[in-house]
Design a protein with these regions (language model features):
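His/Asp/Glu-rich metal-coordinating catalytic cores
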Residues: 1-42, 47-171
Length: 174
């Protein structure tokens, strides 16, 4: 299949070993070389390490690619794009429990609890197999915003079959 989805578009902030460096951006050369296959960009939540490189990537892409995220995350992305003078980005709101078709790839979103509201994980169904990306999450049974990680969805994905899991737990202590 000739379809590709980018899952998060973050950046890193340098540590003391990188004096004079403001930001560390990912190498998007593969994405740019195969941009015609890029069906969408999925963003799991609004933190910089998941959204920070979006303006730089969008400036380098030769076409508008839809960006999928929850309402709060899209609001944060809009502000970031405005700072970089990027107009008319194709922003698409998703909700937990929703599935979208991106070429031959289906992305199903599920709630996760994190230190920022509006966080989701994504279950990708592809011709090559199923990939579960949890996004950043923490195990908190009494979250401030009342949104818990959707363990029923995780169980359902497990029964369906998961070929690869990608997870992070940054800021889990917050």
């Amino acid at each position: 299949a000739n379809d590709m989805v980018l899952d998060d578009a973050g950046l890193m902030f340098p540590d003391d070993n990188h004096p004079g460096v403001d930001l560390i951006l990912p190498d998007y050369s593969y994405v740019l070389e195969h941009a015609d296959k890029l069906r969408g960009i999925v963003i799991t939540h609004g933190h910089e390490d998941h959204t920070g490189s979006l303006p730089y990537l969008l400036k380098d892409l030769d076409r508008k690619v839809p960006i999928y995220a929850t309402k709060l995350t899209l609001g944060l992305i809009e502000g970031k794009l405005k700072e970089h003078k990027i107009k008319n980005a194709k922003l698409c709101e998703i909700k937990p429990g929703q599935s979208i078709k991106l070429g031959c790839i289906t992305a199903e979103f599920f709630s996760v609890n994190h230190s920022i509201p509006g966080a989701v994980g994504v279950f990708f169904r592809t011709p090559a197999g199923n990939v579960l990306h949890t996004g950043d999450f923490k195990l908190d049974q009494s979250p401030i915003d009342g949104v818990r990680t959707d363990f029923a969805a995780l169980s359902r994905f497990s029964e369906e079959g998961v070929d690869s899991v990608s997870y992070t737990h940054l800021r889990a202590h917050e």
